[in-house]
Amino acid sequence: MREHYGVVTPMHNSRPRRVAVLSVHTSPLAQPGTGDAGGMNVYVLQSAIQMARRGVEVEIFTRATSSADAPVQEAAPGVLVRNVVAGPFEGLDKQDLPTQLCAFVAGVLREEARHEPGYYNLVHSHYWLSGQVGWLARDRWGVPLVHTAHTLAAVKNLSLADGDTPEPAARQIGEQQVVAESDRLVANTTEESDQLVRHYGADPNRIDVVAPGADLTRYRPGDRAAARAKLGLDPRETVVTFVGRIQPLKAPDVLLRAAAELIARDPESTLRVLVVGGPSGSGLARPDALIELASSLGIAARVTFLPPQAPDRLVDVYRASDLVAVPSYSESFGLVAIEAQACGTPVIAANVGGLGVAVRNGETGLLVDGHRTEDWATALQSLVSEPGRLAALAAEAPRHAENFSWEHTADGLLESYRMATVNYNYGHGPSEFAPRRAGGLWKLRRAGGVRA
């Protein structure tokens, strides 16, 4: 069918040569586990690296957050990170970022204007803020837009933690626009695909389900005793670990309350809770607040706090743990669960969102319905009190994790890009470019015009 799409040029090949990836609110180079950096950062960087290894150049646009940020950084061969100055470097809350989207758009368009038309063959936006930018870039450049939401306001607002702040209506409106304008939508799971259809009216024929992954060359089973020695953990204790941003959505307090209940039931328990992460979001977001909670629950001596860890150190955290807990109220997938299982560590997780895919219930971990302290304590106790069961889960966990790699993710994304490009070219035909304007900028003329 490709012959029906007109003259084939690099811009109109089904496989892109160069992709503009948009990650407005957080840099792929930021340390996951603090601020707004989390699984999305890992996703953007690792998928870009894998696509570059397949011959697709990737340029990631993100908002500069420090005057020390170089305008361009090479993240890996074939992967550039462009730090766009849009608003103050520090002190700009995530909720205020929409006020700087015009400045960010200008930075992205100016970079493209330095090149010949067709320099970028496709735009892939991550999160709704980036989707707003991608929508305009798509229309200006005459290339397809692929969008990954990562989280959805409508879904988050249905399962808020106590003390958490609802997502504003403006975000849901913005998401609705991006869903309508994207040429392809990438969902982490079939459940997320269903949510896009149910809450945003997305066309299911434009959704591609592509699971995230883990770096399976890094995250793999290792010596638990050696890992505990590196972290200063007692080899005789049973370690249950939380890894992630300290915010109501991630629910580290659920783990602490469950641990306190378990210890109250069994004072001889050797349970140790390890919390690895930094503050983010609203409500119960300060590490100090968790420290105070542990103290009020009478388990302060049983809880160890560590700051966010770099990947080579995070491997030791997973290996040192008997169990990793993911008690989130909402989770589109849950990379921590896959990374932990890849290291041979079972996972106990809330039965929400993509965690039902990331964890194989009863085989590589345990899924808990709801967030009641009693239920979580009982689930924890059922695992830590039965070493044989825990060992069986640990043995199966890496085999399950092998199904999730960034190589598989990149292959899925490239297929989505192919579909987006073929469909876009079929619907729009080749774009026309007017001569350069003064100052070296290109002006795009499209058959259907450019929406205001």
From Swiss-Prot:
Q: Name the SUPFAM superfamilies for this protein.
A: UDP-Glycosyltransferase/glycogen phosphorylase
- An MF annotation (GO) of this entry: magnesium ion binding
Signal peptide positions (record): none
Show the disulfide pairing.
Answer: none
Reaction(s) this enzyme catalyzes, per UniProt: 1D-myo-inositol 3-phosphate + UDP-N-acetyl-alpha-D-glucosamine = 1D-myo-inositol 2-acetamido-2-deoxy-alpha-D-glucopyranoside 3-phosphate + UDP + H(+)
One biological process term in Gene Ontology: mycothiol biosynthetic process
Superkingdom is Bacteria
Q: Does the keyword Glycosyltransferase apply?
A: yes
Q: What class of enzyme is it?
A: transferase
Q: Which EC numbers does the record give?
A: 2.4.1.250
**Where on this chain does UDP-N-acetyl-alpha-D-glucosamine bind?**
31-32, 39, 245, 250, 309, 331, 339
Q: Which residues bind Mg(2+)?
A: 318-319, 321, 345
Q: Where does 1D-myo-inositol 3-phosphate bind?
A: 25, 36-41, 94, 127, 151, 171
Keywords, sorted A to Z: Glycosyltransferase, Magnesium, Metal-binding, Transferase
Q: Which Gene3D superfamilies match?
A: Glycogen Phosphorylase B
Assembly and binders: Homodimer.
Q: Which family does it belong to?
A: Belongs to the glycosyltransferase group 1 family. MshA subfamily.
Task of the protein: Catalyzes the transfer of a N-acetyl-glucosamine moiety to 1D-myo-inositol 3-phosphate to produce 1D-myo-inositol 2-acetamido-2-deoxy-glucopyranoside 3-phosphate in the mycothiol biosynthesis pathway.
Q: Please report the name of this protein according to its UniProt entry.
A: D-inositol 3-phosphate glycosyltransferase
Q: Which organism is it from?
A: Rhodococcus jostii (strain RHA1)
Top-level taxonomy: Bacteria, Bacillati, Actinomycetota, Actinomycetes, Mycobacteriales
